[in-house]
Amino acid sequence: MTTSSEDVLLQMGEVRYKKGDGTLYVMNERVAWMAEHRDTVTVSHRYADIKTQKISPEGKPKVQLQVVLHDGNTSTFHFVNRQGQAAMLADRDKVKELLQQLLPNFKRKVDKDLEDKNRILVENPNLLQLYKDLVITKVLTSDEFWATHAKDHALKKMGRSQEIGVSGAFLADIKPQTDGCNGLKYNLTSDVIHCIFKTYPAVKRKHFENVPAKMSEAEFWTKFFQSHYFHRDRLTAGTKDIFTECGKIDDQALKAAVQQGAGDPLLDLKKFEDVPLEEGFGSVAGDRNVVNSGNIVHQNMIKRFNQHSIMVLKTCANVTSAPSTMTNGTNNANGPVSQSAYTNGMNGKGQATATATKSSSDQVDKDEPQSKKQRLMEKIHYVDLGDPILEGDDSANGEKAKSKHFELSKVERYLNGPVQNSMYDNHNDPMSLEEVQYKLVRNSESWLNRNVQRTFICSKAAVNALGELSPGGSMMRGFQEQSAGQLVPNDFQRELRHLYLSLSELLKHFWSCFPPTSEELETKLQRMHETLQRFKMAKLVPFENRAMHELSPLRSSLTQHLNQLLRTANSKFATWKERKLRNTR
């Protein structure tokens, strides 16, 4: 099971791994698990490969210990001592405490920068191949590669952080547990608290005002779950309830949202009325003047559901809105802002409310024609008929063009498209009837004057003609691309594709240096020219030598275009160098 140099520090029986019972061994340099009635180790992890260990939360029926490796894999061990839950916890704690002492001695310091670079290379296969072709072959150094050629990928990865949405049932997911004293215990995680703050900014503001100046974190959330704000079915609120103002703020926000509408100018929420199914099975409207006399508790419940749905939808809208958009009357946790920029809450009353409502309605009236036009275009626009041509203002078209953002996940999937067939080329040079008749007459004059004598050519000329008509000959240049695609093996095609990818990346940075108007650009131009020369000697010349031995008819045609690109770059660099020397004299 173990080598002679290993000592078993702890042997723990009745440990289950993947539904199999066995024994867990904690040794000097690794942790191992062996199934019952076996003499071979099933699971073995060296301490240097272990990133961290995790244990199951308290109160869970299963007592588990999980080992997380640096490569992301995990191994979970389930302790199943027959003596009960207390014995399971004791066994788990023994293993956990021993691992806590051993793991720091074998802690492998992993550079976060290296992990990020490795993740970028794994997520971008083309960049990984470029790294292999340029860095491993010593055409470029690793620092130059990451500073120049992989800079865009690194910045894109940093700026691609996506906002996590809010679930509509996040409050229902908070399952209370009894504490044994006629009380309830809520287990709040950081994600749930983030969802509450994001959906109800008024609660976030109250949290900033009261924690930790007036109460602790636990006391605040206890008051939140005991408050009238959380239990909306209560008819009266407590006098000491700190969330009473939050309910009023939400009511004002609900009225403003109903007045503003659902963002669809063709839909009017204020025209919706309750029609019982008994009235003609819902097809015949009843008396519109009759006031709904339903249970007020039910009405408050429906009102609360609508309010919650509006707030969840606003969290999605705030992600794409401008940074200047405020929530709950504050732009951050530091203080209030003006009343005209609120979303869910305000500081003043009365006149401030009217001002905010007026400004909001003015904004709605201002944007209504544009939104109605966009909504109508969505109704009459069909994708298969193409984009409609509108005779509108240029500003609307400009804003529409700016709002389009298209990012390609896999660029190679968009590089292949339909190829035009030369058999169906349209010639736009019509000829008149007189011209056609004239050409027919001239051609028909030579039909009867054909020479019937047969002339034979020598065998040498025939062999030369066959050579010219063979693949690679002068007469087959028009079909060279098609024949080359059929004759070149797959490994050569793959390597040639990698050469084009690497050379295109180098040439992109080479040509971006022109015109070299600064010393920095001149230094980069000189460096890129030297890099191109190293690329030719390290990658292109070995490929040509290999093609010369294995693909004799196509040895010169495969790299002809690559050499032409390099010659053009060298010629441009030589011209710039000569001009620079002439100016310095």
UniProtKB/Swiss-Prot annotation:
Record carries keyword rRNA processing: no
Region (Disordered): 324-374
Localization in the cell: Nucleus
Keyword terms, alphabetized: DNA damage, DNA repair, Nucleus, Repeat, Transcription, Transcription regulation
BP GO terms, sorted: DNA repair; nucleotide-excision repair; response to UV; RNA polymerase II promoter clearance; transcription by RNA polymerase I; transcription by RNA polymerase II; transcription initiation at RNA polymerase II promoter; transcription open complex formation at RNA polymerase II promoter
Domain BSD: 104-159, 180-232
Biased composition (Polar residues): 324-362
Entry annotated with the keyword Calcium: no
GO cellular component: nucleus; transcription factor TFIIH core complex; transcription factor TFIIH holo complex
CDD domains, per database record: PH_TFIIH
Superkingdom of source: Eukaryota
UniProt feature, compositional bias: Basic and acidic residues: 363-374
Coarse class of the protein's main subcellular location: nucleus
One Pfam family named in its UniProt record: BSD
Protein family membership: Belongs to the TFB1 family.
Subunit structure, interactors included: Component of the 7-subunit TFIIH core complex composed of XPB/ERCC3, XPD/ERCC2, GTF2H1, GTF2H2, GTF2H3, GTF2H4 and GTF2H5, which is active in NER. The core complex associates with the 3-subunit CDK-activating kinase (CAK) module composed of CCNH/cyclin H, CDK7 and MNAT1 to form the 10-subunit holoenzyme (holo-TFIIH) active in transcription.
Function: Component of the general transcription and DNA repair factor IIH (TFIIH) core complex, which is involved in general and transcription-coupled nucleotide excision repair (NER) of damaged DNA and, when complexed to CAK, in RNA transcription by RNA polymerase II. In NER, TFIIH acts by opening DNA around the lesion to allow the excision of the damaged oligonucleotide and its replacement by a new DNA fragment. In transcription, TFIIH has an essential role in transcription initiation.
Name of this protein: General transcription factor IIH subunit 1
